[in-house]
Amino acid sequence: FMQCETEDDAAKAAEILSDYARHAISSGEPRVMPQVSTACPTIMRLIRMRFPKLIPNIAATVTPVELAAILARREAEAETGLPPEAIGVFAIVPCSSKVTAARVSEGLSRPVLDGAFAIRDIYLRLLNPMRELEEITPMASAGILGLGWASCGGESAARLGERCVAVDGIQNVIRMLEEIEDGRLPEADFLELSACTQGCVGGCFNVENPYAAKLRIKGLLKGLPVSRNRFLFHGEARDIVR
């Protein structure tokens, strides 16, 4: 067993995808509006089952977790010399929907993750060792925009657009999709839809309640740069995102 640590976390990938989205919008893409975020697997299934007319509105891009997994595997390949099939990539996720998505990826030919662990399970194992730490080393590989994706409104804010709508809670999302299907919100360019209250911080596998978690995230963002990552058209993410 060989452990290979990487910095390709979901927040870093979120910043790359946000930067790509800004480039796409400035170049006149996409054509179908409003675009719907792919970040929540529950919402993707909801659209396919109940709102099939809105499938063309789903943004044609991978999710931050998927992009992070692909980049992490490539980094591990380069570091170890092992073939990709000999490398395991696992995610720590906030909800059961993302556990399922780890094994059945939307829009990809095959899953890019080998499995997923619930945040609460990892947290409980780390609780005692964390208490023994005398000094905490900052390890964030993303800035405000990437870390902000964890709560509702963060993805919209990272796009730096004024015509974005963020909705959380499954019933609220259903009502919004009904309005979009009926053409009642033509001014919107982008929909950030989260099944969980307050976004991913409200996932059932989290330890903290979503409102307290959102407050803690605001504290973590203090002093961070706006973003630490950019989408490079000739960079590491080009062949994955496009």
Model region roles, listed by residue range:
Residues 1-242:
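Iron-sulfur-associated redox domains of electron-transfer enzymes in respiratory
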